[in-house]
Amino acid sequence: MKAIIAGGGTGGHLFPAIALAEELRSRRPDLSLLFVGVEGGFEASLLATRGWDFEGIRASGLQGKRLLSRLRSLTLIPSGLIRSLSILRRFRPDVVVGFGGYASAAMVLSGVLARVPTVIHEQNALPGLANRWLGRIVDRVAVAFEEASEFFPKSKVRVTGNPVRAELFGVSRAEAATRLGLDPNRFTLLIFGGSQGAHRLNQAVMEALPMLTDERERIQFIHATGPRDLSLVRQGYDALGCPAVVEPFFQAMAVAYATADLCFCRAGAGTVAELCALGKPSVLVPFPFAA
């Protein structure tokens, strides 16, 4: 069996795709799988550490950009489609699965044009325009939420939920805390804002930290800041003498989850699925421009 999984740009698209890939590999040892994502995106290095083959497409989003940036993004569409068709001809997959992200639409559309079976997975309750359009022409649509079904042809829809990586389970708190250099008996707050970080969450924590005068003696922190705020946040914890592990991004998220008593994070669909599966108490902050 040969499959292409297309998606990336953010962890919300990539990690459910990885979960599916790992499950397929466990069920089909003969599986030959290729990930396709954004050229130069964070997914390339992350997938390489996991041993997955990857090819990149030049692509960029349109939403929320200035006019010139949008025009530049539009010029990448033809080259992205040509590149996708080239990948398809060389790899000859039995199926193409799209998980969203800038590169996913081009790859899935190429699959449709080449008459390869195609599937898209919609992680959110309110699908974006690209998936709504693709839903009309692909063979199957998998949705995480029942509410999303109304945006697609009923005969194509299957409610699957959001895939969660098996690696997140089975790590003990003691082992995880030791790997992070933290105290397994101390209350641990895990803060993260998705694969790119969340500036407002980082800012809110830094503003609140000085107010925790008594609690700081009993709390330790794990904080994924994103690349932008790394130095600022590290300095904030150091200035107050707070035990904290601060990184731009945690590839070993299983270790962070296993150590955490409480999560303070963005309410991304993939994150919520992981928190529910792990039974982690959480304070969720929705991103105002997503559903």
Language model regions located:
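Conserved nucleotide-sugar phosphate-binding/catalytic loop shared by glycosyltransferases and other
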Residues: 2-8, 27-76, 227-229
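Acidic donor-binding loop of glycosyltransferase active sites
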Residues: 93-95, 250, 254, 258-271, ...
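Short alpha-helix at the nucleotide-sugar/activated-sugar donor binding site of glycosyltransferases
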Residues: 112, 135, 257, 275-276, ...
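Glycosyltransferases and closely related glycan-assembly transferases
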Residues: 83-96, 104-119, 132-140
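Active-site-proximal region of nucleotide-activated glycan assembly enzymes
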Residues: 53, 112-174
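Structural loop-to-beta junction motif characteristic of Rossmann-like glycosyltransferase folds
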Residues: 52, 116-117, 261-262, 279-287
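Donor-nucleotide binding loops and adjacent catalytic segments primarily
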Residues: 36, 41, 46, 50, ...
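Short amphipathic alpha-helix
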Residues: 13-25
